[in-house]
Amino acid sequence: MDLSELERDNTGRCRLSSPVPAVCLKEPCVLGVDEAGRGPVLGPMVYAICYCPLSRLADLEALKVADSKTLTENERERLFAKMEEDGDFVGWALDILSPNLISTSMLGRVKYNLNSMSHDTAAGLIQHAMDQNVKVTQVFVDTVGMPETYQARLQQRFPGIEVTVKAKADSLFPVVSAASIIAKVARDQAVKNWQFVESLQGLDSDYGSGYPNDPKTKAWLRKHVDPVFGFPQFVRFSWSTAQAILEKEAESVTWEDSAAEEDPEGPGRITSYFSQGPQACRPQVSHKYFQERGLETATSL
């Protein structure tokens, strides 16, 4: 799989797709959606679709595709190579979301959580296939969150398509199994060949599974945290594991707004402004604009 586009710029998102088989432009097709790397604190999350004509679904099943988590890396790569050889009836596309994109989205002023990101990415890939004139008539999706809600959302967006969302869909439907293999092969390759934009001394590539509860991954995070700049962009700094290490190992920063929010005095209850007690005599704090410029209210001239 050629991920050179991602290797040139791994700070955002990258979409790749196979050529569309001619038969998929003419015959009704089934499409599967799955992801790899949703939970790890390291590396990208990859969403993939795989599609083929309904008339050739038995040929896809004959490849003996299975849930990627039950296969070894060599088995996944062998099956992906077979799907590439069968490009006359099998097509695919994938979206690679970088750790940097995931974290900045989750921690932005307007929060964009991982579930919403996942739903939108899956829908975007289905739309991508349709924009390429693939005759999609059935879609099978491995669920994120409540399957009923997710299915209703996709069905509303794609009213002309029969949508099925199930837990463990990657072990129930071969076309979803194929998508899971494609996603996992792409993520494994992306992680293995990750281009660090930071100049890191003594970079250790042995970071374990990348999952938050892996001791080797935690050790790697502690080793490569900078006390001022934090983690390299390979790390999803929005994950609680990374945040806990930052709080312990990095320099603390107090922002003015944070200090104001943590003020124990606070504004208090609204009824306190109408009381005659000592709190009613609390001096009013002027706006930050006036404090920064040393401006005070003049009571006399």
From Swiss-Prot:
Binding, a divalent metal cation: D34, E35, D142
Localisation per UniProt entry: Nucleus
EC numbers on record: 3.1.26.4
Chain segments annotated as coiled-coil in the UniProt record: none
This protein's GO CC annotations: nucleus; ribonuclease H2 complex
Keyword list, A-Z: Acetylation, Endonuclease, Hydrolase, Metal-binding, Nuclease, Nucleus, Phosphoprotein
Cofactor note: Manganese or magnesium. Binds 1 divalent metal ion per monomer in the absence of substrate. May bind a second metal ion after substrate binding.
Top-level lineage group: Eukaryota
Phosphoserine: residues carrying this PTM: S258
Reactions performed catalytically: Endonucleolytic cleavage to 5'-phosphomonoester
GO biological process: DNA replication, removal of RNA primer; mismatch repair; RNA catabolic process
Family: Belongs to the RNase HII family. Eukaryotic subfamily.
UniProt name for this protein: Ribonuclease H2 subunit A
Biological classification of the source: Eukaryota, Metazoa, Chordata, Craniata, Vertebrata
